[in-house]
Amino acid sequence: MTADLPDFVPDFEKTGGLVPAIAQDAVSGEVLMMAWMNEEAWHRTLTTGEAHYFSRSRGSLWHKGGTSGHTQHIRAVRLDCDSDTILLLVDQIGGAACHKGYKSCFFRELKDGEISVCSPLVFDPEEVYK
């Protein structure tokens, strides 16, 4: 998955080196997660076909699913009109994008004044991240 389009590059300079990257299920359209990408994560994502992000807490590159096996295979990449937000259309391998074990990181919902879990729990994080 390579892109040689000169204007198809996020504006990392404008955003201080990190841009938000939203992962969305390519089939269902469900939003799975939001993480950050720096230039290295962007290039690795495009060259490997799997999502790579930058972990602000660890200060390092992060291959999504590198520990859990729940990788994200890239089907398409989109940039917003200002080139400062990335949208990844992905096949979520292993069924879960969230490190807490849920299909989506957006697993909590406030609706009609009630808070509920709206995304299935796929795995036990204590078993996966030993």
Swiss-Prot record:
Listed cofactors: Mg(2+); Zn(2+)
Q: Name one GO cellular component term.
A: cytoplasm
Disulfide bond residue pairs: none
Q: Which InterPro entries match?
A: PRA-CH (IPR026660), PRib_AMP_CycHydrolase_dom (IPR002496), PRib_AMP_CycHydrolase_sf (IPR038019)
The record's cofactor note says: Binds 1 Mg(2+) ion per subunit.
* Residues binding Zn(2+): C81, C98, C105
Pathway participation: Amino-acid biosynthesis; L-histidine biosynthesis; L-histidine from 5-phospho-alpha-D-ribose 1-diphosphate: step 3/9
**Location of the protein in the cell:** Cytoplasm
Please list the residues that bind Mg(2+): D80, D82, D84
What molecular function does GO assign, one term? Answer: magnesium ion binding
Alphabetically list the UniProt keywords. Answer: Amino-acid biosynthesis, Cytoplasm, Histidine biosynthesis, Hydrolase, Magnesium, Metal-binding, Zinc
The record's Gene Ontology biological-process terms are: L-histidine biosynthetic process
| Subcellular location, principal | cytoplasm
Q: What function does this protein fulfil? A: Catalyzes the hydrolysis of the adenine ring of phosphoribosyl-AMP.
**What is the annotated quaternary arrangement, including any partners?**
Homodimer.
Q: What is this protein called?
A: Phosphoribosyl-AMP cyclohydrolase
User: What species was this sequence derived from?
Assistant: Oleidesulfovibrio alaskensis (strain ATCC BAA-1058 / DSM 17464 / G20)
